[in-house]
Amino acid sequence: MTKQKIAVLGPGSWGTALAQVLNDNGHEVRLWGNVVEQIEEINTNHTNQRYFKDITLDSKIKAYTNLEEAINNVDSILFVVPTKVTRLVAKQVANLLKHKVVLMHASKGLEPGTHERLSTILEEEISEQYRSDIVVVSGPSHAEEAIVRDITLITAASKDIEAAKYVQKLFSNHYFRLYTNTDVVGVETAGALKNIIAVGAGALHGLGYGDNAKAAIITRGLAEITRLGVQLGADPLTFSGLSGVGDLIVTGTSVHSRNWRAGDALGRGEKLEDIEKNMGMVIEGISTTKVAYEIAQNLNVYMPITEAIYKSIYEGANIKDSILDMMSNEFRSENEWH
């Protein structure tokens, strides 16, 4: 692939890691953020200490606070901003974009209030005149591992397979590999909902439960993610792939996962506001729990784990009691998809 110009919007841990992958592939990478000190640090010291204490970035990665400069004459734009500000940033991009680009996002969440997936937000806010079909970049990927060039396999999903193939080539190298998929609904739903299950898995650990319980919540969590995804129009096979079970494993079993760590702290009795303050990073699973619970209620989809986490976070229920209550739920077949 010839050298591309790419704007990466969001200099968080994942945005920074993806910027480095793209830079390793010989592309011109422009990293955009709105914290002046952070942008100056990246440009001057080639570090992003808030997220990576011991990593030096390539000096060719340039950071910007001016969005217009960052997206000027680029071939593609990658959104890696928190879910809650995706629409705001998309509106800003729409007002500045003067040419057609390949539009990608690598965030995982559902918009509070509207319940919309992030690709839908981008479609609504940025005219088709100036973008490709949205490409979703998602899968089992800790930024802490990708940044040190550990082997990572994820998915590029788009309704337009050619756009997905473009992104596949854009990112893939000897340590980072993408597979294509056309099931955007499934890939985005899996990526968002696995954060809820990761909170639950972390809570089990914090409560002192063992591997049996953790395996149970991950497996049954996958079942309810699939149930809701299918109701939303997803292909059930997607949930057995990288963006489904793969992402669920990596997020639901690792201390690298901020959602798992948040659940662990909840299980140990810490208050949510203290957890969010101490972590200093967005915990997407918290807001996604509320959105997923509301969608499940509207569609009458059975999601007992999501409901238990919701009641613990938003209704003040005891996390241990909420989890144990699931053990007395009505008996069901393992393969019920409704």
Swiss-Prot record:
What keywords are annotated for this sequence in UniProt? Answer: Cytoplasm, Lipid biosynthesis, Lipid metabolism, NAD, NADP, Nucleotide-binding, Oxidoreductase, Phospholipid biosynthesis, Phospholipid metabolism
Q: In which pathway does it act?
A: Membrane lipid metabolism; glycerophospholipid metabolism
Q: Where in the cell is it found?
A: Cytoplasm
Q: Among the record's GO biological process terms, what is one? A: glycerol-3-phosphate biosynthetic process
- Top EC category: oxidoreductase
Enumerate the catalysed reactions: sn-glycerol 3-phosphate + NAD(+) = dihydroxyacetone phosphate + NADH + H(+); sn-glycerol 3-phosphate + NADP(+) = dihydroxyacetone phosphate + NADPH + H(+)
- Give the domain of life: Bacteria
Q: Which residues form a coiled coil?
A: none
Provide the active-site residues from the annotation.
194 (proton acceptor)
Matching PROSITE patterns, A to Z?
NAD_G3PDH
MF terms from GO for this chain are: glycerol-3-phosphate dehydrogenase [NAD(P)+] activity; NAD binding
Q: Which Gene3D superfamilies match?
A: N-(1-d-carboxylethyl)-l-norvaline Dehydrogenase, domain 2, NAD(P)-binding Rossmann-like Domain
Q: Which InterPro entries match?
A: 6-PGluconate_DH-like_C_sf, 6PGD_dom2, G3P_DH_NAD-dep, G3P_DH_NAD-dep_C, G3P_DH_NAD-dep_N, NAD(P)-bd_dom_sf
Assigned protein family:
Belongs to the NAD-dependent glycerol-3-phosphate dehydrogenase family.
This molecule's function is given as: Catalyzes the reduction of the glycolytic intermediate dihydroxyacetone phosphate (DHAP) to sn-glycerol 3-phosphate (G3P), the key precursor for phospholipid synthesis.
**Identification of the protein by name:** Glycerol-3-phosphate dehydrogenase [NAD(P)+]
Identify the species of origin: Streptococcus agalactiae serotype V (strain ATCC BAA-611 / 2603 V/R)
Q: Which gene encodes it?
A: gpsA
